[in-house]
């Protein structure tokens, strides 16, 4: 025993028992070495007595010092490897495409990885590794590597938790030996393998340093055995095969890490392979120009389509010196009524959409009255607008690149741009140009059709044989010129702004003389309910509610924010500030179509109900005068604002308790959507889009979003409004429930944009 020293075990899995280690004078293990040539470690009984068989004190101290130095080196190496593991994990996690298929295979003989996981280090495993498969090495150091440190075990626990989610692919293995000099260099791509377990005898275990498995992190299923069973694999061919496998695994890992991976890679567009170039053409576009819902649609729908991955442009007239659009430098000349008219294109890129404005002396200085002038003047403006708009994809280099006519779809809106599908066919398709360009015509209000005498055909500058699509027979006025009729016949697809309105258009009452054409083209007609711009119309973000006593609010702060906005509105308009009085609002065009006359008939009844009424709008002169008269007669209860103000419309929507929309017909309607977003309850005539968007309140099931009436009569309006006021005063919980349902709806344009996309795809593949 003179060549033995007494050591204390540092293994965390076993008690601190002294170990008696045999120190041979010289040990060289080669292929075919016997078991006697291995180091032998025997457990000895721990006694507090000095052993005569132990080495001298000096030899023990020297051996212990050498062991400590070795331990420090191995610990340092382990810490370095753990740091490299963390760095490698970041790289692996960024390789998204390889994570799903990150499965290795593990074979105990060949060293491959299969169905294994990080072993459970909480079990009481013995970390000694016996093996009869001797790897040829020489000059083995006299001291045994220490057991795995606590830091290493803790790090493995962390790695196991991380890999459960990451499912990282197997990495290259590195051999760690306890030779006199650590000859292997650990690269940044190598990681650690947990040493497997060996069957233990009651008194002794064998440790073959050279047969330790390389330390590698492996994902997968739970390991079946912490140690591979002992094998008698000593052939040189097996060792060579194993080395080749290790080199191959390392090369594959190197290739994976060297491949550049873009961490910020964008996901594919929502439109998938159906991404198109879309140009929406409208006579108005919010916030630059707006008289109704058409301007809102032109300002919001393109942004939703752009979010789906399409390249989108909006083309509108430049009625004023807008600050955002800049002169593109492109100028063109078009003939209108035999005269040359020069146009200039102004361009801006906002929220992923190209906005192009056509500037001409025919559009300038019209101001708010964008449809002003006589019938012929309006027709000439629209002829110029459509001629210039259809050539925008060729002439205006948005972002440095023109749209071109490939994979292109035009979206025309109402009669103002109904000439566009006609020009597309007459000027281009009939001449073999833009054969794959499609057009979709959207009906916002079929009551306005661009009607006139047949002589107006001379202004549109078309070949004589195109006269027939414009002809329409009216039982009252006889045969006449109709632009909307020609657009409906030549467009590839037709869209209405609600499902209810698409049904009404097919009737003689709702089709306004065009119902026969619509029924003949029913196969290409589809109704799509409008959405709203949830950035502009959002009580939490509304910039118009950030001053003058108003405040932004959400569903959580509705009970405090909305009363404050109501008080601020009453104060701003000079009405008595009373929280208990229902405040009723109306926002819209002063026109019989909007049911303003029904409100006028119901005003005497309203004034007897202790309510306040605020009306905002412009339109017919007699109805504007009626508004002023109501304010004079009921100065403490009614306010009439003749004109239109975006700020005031937002504040009325936020401050009012109830919104009236008694329209005789309403293709879609947006004000009821704005009102519901702000927790203002709508009372509407159940027509068109109002029927689609406002579900009647059901007090028995606590469902519904407002009140509706079926006939355009003052008595019907009074009945619905009376039930609404009763609920407001007597059933607060039901009222708050209606507000909650209104405010939690998804009213964004995203759903509508997806439906529009389906229509555009159908037009694209139409032959």
UniProtKB/Swiss-Prot annotation:
Expression induction or repression: Constant expression in light and darkness.
Free-text function comment from the UniProt entry:
Accounts for only 10 to 15% of the total soluble starch synthase activity in tubers.
Species name? Solanum tuberosum (Potato)
Acidic residues: compositionally biased ranges:
253-262
Q: What keyword terms does UniProt attach to this protein?
A: Amyloplast, Chloroplast, Glycosyltransferase, Plastid, Starch biosynthesis, Transferase, Transit peptide
The UniProt entry, under InterPro entries, shows: GS/SS, Starch_synth_cat_dom
Segments of skewed composition (Low complexity)? 172-188
For the keyword Glycosyltransferase, the answer is yes
Give the location in the cell: Plastid, Chloroplast; Plastid, Amyloplast
The record's comment on protein family reads: Belongs to the glycosyltransferase 1 family. Bacterial/plant glycogen synthase subfamily.
Which GO molecular function terms does the record list? alpha-1,4-glucan glucosyltransferase (ADP-glucose donor) activity; alpha-1,4-glucan glucosyltransferase (UDP-glucose donor) activity
Residue interval of the organelle targeting sequence: 1-45
> Which pathway does it operate in?
Glycan biosynthesis; starch biosynthesis
Further remarks about this protein from its record: May be the main starch synthase responsible for the incorporation of phosphorylated precursors into growing alpha-1,4-glucans.
Q: Which reaction does it catalyse?
A: [(1->4)-alpha-D-glucosyl](n) + ADP-alpha-D-glucose = [(1->4)-alpha-D-glucosyl](n+1) + ADP + H(+)
Chief subcellular location equals: plastid
Per the record, what is one GO cellular component?
chloroplast
Q: Which CDD domains match?
A: GT5_Glycogen_synthase_DULL1-like (cd03791)
Q: So which domain of life are we looking at?
A: Eukaryota
Q: Where is the composition biased (Basic and acidic residues)?
A: 230-245
Keyword flag Transferase: yes
Outline the segment boundaries, as ranges, of region: Disordered.
160-204, 226-268
Which protein are we looking at? Answer: Granule-bound starch synthase 2, chloroplastic/amyloplastic
**Residues annotated as binding ADP-alpha-D-glucose:** 290
Q: What is its EC number?
A: 2.4.1.21
- GO BP: starch biosynthetic process
């Amino acid at each position: 025993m003179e060549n033995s020293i007494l050591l204390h075990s540092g293994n965390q899995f076993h008690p601190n028992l002294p170990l008696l280690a045999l120190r041979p004078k010289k040990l060289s293990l080669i292929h075919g070495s016997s078991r006697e040539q291995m180091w032998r470690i025997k457990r000895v009984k721990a006694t507090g007595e000095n052993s005569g068989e132990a080495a001298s004190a000096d030899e023990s101290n020297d051996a212990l010092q050498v062991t400590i130095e070795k331990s420090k080196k191995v610990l340092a190496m382990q810490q370095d490897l753990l740091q490299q593991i963390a760095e490698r994990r970041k790289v692996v996690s960024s390789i998204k495409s390889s994570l799903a298929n990150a499965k290795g295979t593990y074979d105990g003989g060949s060293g491959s990885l299969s169905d294994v996981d990080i072993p459970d280090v909480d079990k009481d495993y013995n970390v000694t590794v016996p093996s009869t498969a001797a790897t040829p090495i020489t000059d083995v150091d006299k001291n045994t590597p220490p057991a795995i440190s606590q830091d290493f075990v803790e790090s493995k626990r962390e790695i196991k938790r991380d890999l459960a989610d990451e499912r990282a692919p197997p990495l290259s293995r590195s051999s760690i030996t306890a030779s006199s000099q650590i000859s292997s260099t650990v690269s940044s791509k190598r990681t650690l393998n947990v040493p497997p377990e060996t069957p233990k005898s009651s008194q002794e275990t064998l440790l073959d340093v050279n047969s330790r498995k390389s330390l590698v992190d492996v994902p997968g299923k739970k390991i079946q055995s912490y140690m591979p069973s002992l094998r008698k694999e000593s052939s040189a061919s097996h060792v060579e095969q194993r080395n080749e496998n290790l080199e191959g695994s390392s090369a594959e890992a190197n290739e994976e890490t060297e491949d550049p991976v873009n961490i910020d890679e964008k996901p594919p567009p929502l439109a998938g392979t159906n991404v198109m170039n879309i140009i929406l053409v409208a006579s108005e576009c919010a916030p630059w120009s707006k008289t109704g819902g058409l301007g809102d649609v032109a300002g919001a729908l393109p942004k939703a389509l752009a979010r789906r991955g399409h390249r989108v442009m909006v083309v509108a007239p430049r009625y004023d010196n807008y600050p955002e659009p800049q002169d593109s430098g492109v100028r063109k000349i078009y003939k209108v009524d035999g005269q040359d008219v020069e146009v200039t294109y102004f361009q801006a890129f906002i929220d992923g959409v190209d906005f192009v404005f056509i500037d001409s002396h025919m559009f300038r200085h019209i101001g708010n009255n964008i449809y002003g002038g006589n019938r012929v003047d309006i027709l000439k403006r629209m002829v110029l607008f459509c001629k210039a708009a259809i050539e925008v994809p060729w002439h205006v280099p948005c972002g440095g690149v023109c749209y071109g006519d490939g994979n292109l779809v035009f979206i025309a809106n109402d009669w103002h741009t109904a000439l566009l599908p006609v020009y597309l066919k007459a000027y281009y398709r009939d001449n073999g140009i833009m054969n794959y360009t499609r057009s979709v015509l959207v009906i916002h209000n079929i009551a306005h059709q661009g009607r006139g005498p047949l002589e107006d055909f001379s202004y549109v500058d078309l070949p004589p044989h195109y006269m027939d699509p414009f002809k329409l027979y009216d039982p009252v006025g006889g045969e006449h010129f109709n632009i909307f009729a020609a657009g409906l016949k030549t467009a590839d697809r037709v869209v209405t702004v609600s499902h209810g309105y698409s049904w009404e258009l097919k009737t003689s009452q709702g089709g306004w003389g065009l119902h026969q054409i619509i029924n003949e083209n029913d196969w290409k007609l589809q109704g799509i309910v409008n959405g709203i711009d949830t950035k502009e119309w959002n009580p939490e973000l509304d910039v118009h509610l950030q001053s003058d006593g108003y405040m932004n609010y959400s569903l959580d702060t509705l009970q405090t924010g909305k009363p404050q906005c109501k008080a601020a509105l009453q104060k701003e308009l000079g009405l008595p500030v009373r929280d208990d009085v229902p405040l009723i609002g109306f926002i819209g065009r002063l026109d019989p179509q909007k049911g303003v006359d029904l409100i006028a008939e119901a005003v005497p009844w309203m004034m007897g109900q202790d309510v306040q009424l605020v009306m905002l709008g412009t339109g017919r002169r007699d109805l504007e005068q009626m508004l002023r008269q109501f304010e004079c007669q009921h100065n403490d209860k009614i306010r009439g604002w003749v004109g239109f103000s975006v700020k005031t419309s937002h504040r009325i929507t936020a401050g009012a308790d109830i919104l009236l929309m008694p329209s005789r017909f309403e293709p879609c309607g947006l004000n009821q959507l704005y009102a519901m977003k702000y927790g203002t309850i709508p009372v509407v005539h159940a027509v068109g889009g109002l029927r689609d968007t406002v579900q009647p309140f059901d007090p028995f099931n606590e469902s519904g979003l407002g009140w509706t009436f079926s006939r355009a009569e003052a008595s019907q309006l009074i009945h619905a409004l009376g039930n609404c006021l009763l609920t407001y005063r007597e059933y607060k919980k039901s009222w708050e429930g209606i507000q909650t349902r209104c405010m939690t709806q998804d009213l964004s344009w995203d759903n509508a944009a997806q439906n529009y996309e389906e229509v555009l795809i159908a037009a694209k593949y139409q032959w």
